Amino acid sequence: MSDPCGKKLVQEISPTMSLWGLEDRHSCQGQPQPDQDPVAKEASASELQMKVDFFRKLGYSSSEIHSALQKLGVQADTNTVLGELVKHGSATERECQASTDPCPQPPLVPRGGSTPKPSTVEPSLPEEDKESSDLRPVVIDGSNVAMSHGNKEVFSCRGILLAVNWFLERGHTDITVFVPSWRKEQPRPDVPITDQHILRELEKKKILVFTPSRRVGGKRVVCYDDRFIVKLAYESDGVVVSNDTYRDLQGERQEWKRFIEERLLMYSFVNDKFMPPDDPLGRHGPSLDNFLRKKPLPSEHRKQPCPYGRKCTYGIKCRFFHPERPSRPQRSVADELRANALLSPPRTPVKDKSSQRPSPASQPNSMSLEAEPGSPDGKKLGTRSSPGPHQEGSTQTCAPAGRSLPVSGGSFGPTEWLPHTLDSLPYTSQECLDSGIGSLESQMSELWGLRGGSPGESGPTRGPYTGYQTYGSKLPAAPAFSPFRQAIGTGHFSVPTDYVPPPPTYPAREYWSEPYPLPPPTPVLQEPQRPRPRASGDPWGRVSDLAKERAGVYTKLCGVFPPHLVEAVMGRFPQLLDPQQLAAEILSYKSQHLSE
């Protein structure tokens, strides 16, 4: 198929372009041109197809692209065709908007013959109208505002304009300003007025209202403008803008008194700027935004952040907000003490102090240990010492009440000395720990003993968890520093049967707060023994080091946590000596019992 100019149409090559005459109309004018190369025709067709696809992706229909290409020609560039499409599309939209069908479609009638009720669609108000309808009406005391802006000397009408503009910027539409009518008269030297033209401009906009006044017999009769202000604000449920408290009007009607107390908005002028307070009814009242609304917005009840921050020393009594503190409800000291009392094990009834502290003469200072029936000798292992005043009730036993001291061929295991239940765990009296860490150390030294034997002979110290009983126990007493009580540590060790314990280093004290007296002179042995070198595997050395270390860890932890918690956790983990790990275990133990 050929055109009159002797040129084949491109639509034969690309059937998708058959909608339009893609020939160049301008090329047909004049002399006929020779036929182009088929490769060139195919390239031009593919380029044209790319343009068409591009315009279709932009959202234009085939008819719009057809008309634009017929008007501009195939060789027009993309920007020119796109500009034509934009113009054509905007014109089409205007035609569609102008030709909208004014008659609505008839409603669907259900079967049964009953006519449906006409659907009444409430007109949706614009967002600005909704916002303004939610705001309260504003009634401004014009005389008070103008005199305040004029520093109580000049009636400055500019102050009224500043107040009106402030409320207009917030979206208020119902604004009324009351001014006595004599203020629009010619000003006198004794009553100066500035910017008087503002009153007339606001009156034309129906914002300002002049209260009536007249002259009778050469005298001006002025109506009380304050009554106009309060009455209109009360009837319209609005807000009064004034620094006057209207005491005389509060006494006239009880409802006016309450209304003035709740709806009076005071203000200040700062460098020609109208500034009402952010809290019109005080610190604990509503915000200014909610004060000017009919329906207050829900506000976040969040306390003001504490000005001291982390340096605040008020604790839970601080009424400000601390973001660094946990959100859980704070407990008072009394509640903490009650919770700790629930965690502590039940205590046995304590007898009188006279029964707690028996006389030294009535205290037997002996401890007998029977060998097992299967032992080869079958003898009784016993150690006796003369009664002395060096023992107290807190250091008389080496095992909890109701437990006998196990003996296995003269070999003692430290793990058998430890209590296995929480109820049998000993605890230190709290009244002995109320004096601080110093009292605690003296209490611990009294319970365990810091050294044993003579000065030339260092003995191992007893650990704090071998167990001890309360005052008044009926178990046989043991010397305060006997090696049987000091046998705590890893591994077993043996004690010779003919071993005689050394005399005590410190005499007894009647009260724990008394200082230690000077130690008695040590008797000189006739046959001094040679100091035996301690082997690396000596169990006495290991026991001594372990007991000292556990005693130090216990003392440190008791300065932070209650003693019964420390004893309970260290009883559960006898081989654990790391204070940090023990502290973590104490916290977890405490949280578990709190949850219970």
Curated annotation (Swiss-Prot):
Belongs to the ZC3H12 family. Residues 81-150 are annotated as: Necessary for interaction with TANK. GO terms for biological process: 3'-UTR-mediated mRNA destabilization; angiogenesis; apoptotic process; cell differentiation; cellular response to chemokine; cellular response to glucose starvation; cellular response to ionomycin; cellular response to lipopolysaccharide. Its main location: nucleus. It comes from Rattus norvegicus (Rat). Residues 135-290 form the RNase NYN domain. Mg(2+) is required for RNase activity. Oligomer. Found in a deubiquitination complex with TANK, USP10 and ZC3H12A; this complex inhibits genotoxic stress- or interleukin-1-beta-mediated NF-kappaB activation by promoting IKBKG or TRAF6 deubiquitination. Interacts with IKBKG; this interaction increases in response to DNA damage. Interacts with TANK; this interaction increases in response to DNA damage and serves as a bridge to anchor both TANK and USP10 into a deubiquitinating complex. Interacts with TRAF6; this interaction increases in response to DNA damage and is stimulated by TANK. CDD domains: PIN_Zc3h12-like. The gene is Zc3h12a. The C3H1-type zinc finger domain and C-terminal region are necessary for pre-miRNA binding. The C-terminal region and proline-rich domain are necessary for oligomerization. The modification Phosphoserine is found at S99, S344, S435, S439. This is Endoribonuclease ZC3H12A.
